[in-house]
Amino acid sequence: AVLVKTFVEAGADVSWSGCNPLSTQDDVAAALAADGVSIFAWHGMNVEEFYWCIEESLRFKPNLTLDDGADLIFTIHNKHQELVPNVIGGTEETTTGVHRLRSMAEAGALKYPVIAVNDAETKWDFDNVYGTGQSTLDGILRATSVLIAGKNVVVAGFGHCGRGVALRAKGLGANVIVTEISPTTALKATLEGFRVMTMNEAATVGDIFVTATGVKDIIVERHFKSMKDGAIVCNTGHYDCEVNIHDLEKLKKSVREVRANNEEYLLKNGRRIYLLAKGRLV
């Protein structure tokens, strides 16, 4: 909202849509709309509604695109290349989006310049570590009201975001376990005092699981089957592909919402798994 207001005060016309189906705060969106900003988003959109909002925002024929996850840029390139000549350039805020756009650029498919905001030191070394670390734990606490101290918290990935989550969990008294595929990064986690193991091993002992990799299928069927009763599972990567929800659905006997952004999956084996924010950005 602050960024949107800054652009408006600088003389720009702004069209805004959400970067994630669950990330929009309706009161903030309503306040901006009341000030005359074109808003296409609401909390709890499904996938079809999410992309409909992007399509509506593109009717604006933008000169600049500001993205978080690259869905806006992807939609322009895949469905509305007629808009490309009008676009001076864009920005991409998050790690996952930058990875997607770098792949496009390497393939020669990126049609206009994009600034990788995530590569800025103030983003990479500060927001990713300390901002994501704190906001992830805040999201878990709001959705569960669980005591972190003494819990086995499994963090998948020890990049900047994963490291931030691990540090904040450790600061709250958790026993932190890190899973990491890079030997060098795994060694860094070890030297910072964290236990390192595979997800197959961690699945049997974890109380709270947080994925922070940007890679799909980090937690899958075999891991759900191994988890203890009452395990909490969430994701702090941008997309909902890290925790395989399809696999969890196959194992369920029933599902119910126990708190806002907290669903209890009763499995056929009698154990319960609590999925936060539908596996999206917690």
Task: Name the predicted role of every residue range.
Residues A1-E121, R256, A260, L267-G270, ...:
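N-terminal ligand-binding/catalytic initiation module
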Residues L3-V4, D27-A30, W52-C53, F74-Q81, ...:
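Short acidic, glycine/serine/threonine-rich loops at helix termini
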Residues I73-F74, T122-W124, G162-R163, T185-A186, ...:
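Flexible loop/turn segments at secondary-structure boundaries
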Residues A1-V4, V8-G11, D127, G131-V205, ...:
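Glycine-rich phosphate/diphosphate-binding loop of Rossmann-like nucleotide-binding domains
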Residues N20, I181-S182, Y239:
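Residues in the short beta-alpha loop(s) of Rossmann-like NAD(P)-binding domains
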Residues A12, V37, P62-N63, A70-F74, ...:
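Generic secondary-structure signature for well-ordered alpha-helical cores
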Residues A186, T190-R271:
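Rossmann-like adenosine-cofactor binding region
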Residues D13-S15, H43, Y112-G150, I245-V282:
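Adenosine-phosphate binding glycine-rich loop
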